[in-house]
Amino acid sequence: MGRGRIEIKRIENTTSRQVTFCKRRNGLLKKAYELSVLCDAEVALIVFSSRGRLYEYSNNNNVKATIDRYKKAHACGSTSGAPLIEVNAQQYYQQESAKLRHQIQMLQNTNKHLVGDNVSNLSLKELKQLESRLEKGISKIRARKNELLASEINYMAKREIELQNDNMDLRTKIAEEEQQLQQVTVARSAAMELQAAAAAQQQQQNPFAVAAAQLDMKCFFPLNLFEAAAQVQAVAAQRQQIIPTELNLGYHHHLAIPGAAAADAPPPHF
């Protein structure tokens, strides 16, 4: 069911009238506040109860200034509309400028108080409020600092685990490479041993071929005995030949075998 219409007339019951006054007064103050905030309007509300108690509201916390503005506007309203608008605009901007200057001054004082300046003129209550604000600020700062430190510690722990894993991988690779190098070294040693065993076996089977190969490596004698025999035969053939120059001179030169001593050759005859 919908709410029934209430007849607008004086409430005879004193208690009911007082309760209704409180409710309607609070609603009126709320509406005045909403009007000033939503519409950026200057609102002043003055209420007297049946017992003569004063209730007032002003969005700039100065009902008297609003009343003075009203008086000036009412005084200028009889002349023309344009001057009234100009006066109202000028008063509005002056009030707004004063508000802004006051807010700036308050903020500057607050900033100075936060760093410990100009606290000599503060009362005990204001000092307690300032102390409470500073403690709350320090608590928030410490909480944020601890949060950042915890995050940094977690990151460093993860980084440590990653570095340990990388170190393990590197050690594994180094061990594998050392094992491969050891295998190659063992294989080379085995191959050299096999070559030495094969050379020893070949020397036992054919010692003259091995000796000839060793002499050839040192460049002392020809490669094999067949070449040596051929050189001896060539020297013998030269001995059997007579050089014409030696015959004309009346002597013949004894050809020396390569490698023979110089003392074995006969002296020449003149």
Curated annotation (Swiss-Prot):
InterPro entries with a match to the protein in the record: MADS-box/MEF2_TF, MEF2-like_N, TF_Kbox, TF_MADSbox, TF_MADSbox_sf
Single GO MF descriptor: DNA-binding transcription factor activity, RNA polymerase II-specific
Residue ranges annotated for the MADS-box domain, each copy included: 1-61
Source superkingdom: Eukaryota
Pfam families per UniProt: K-box, SRF-TF
Subunit structure: May interact with MADS6, MADS7 and MADS8.
Function noted in UniProt: Probable transcription factor.
Protein name per Swiss-Prot or TrEMBL: MADS-box transcription factor 13
Organism of origin: Oryza sativa subsp. japonica
Gene name of the record: MADS13
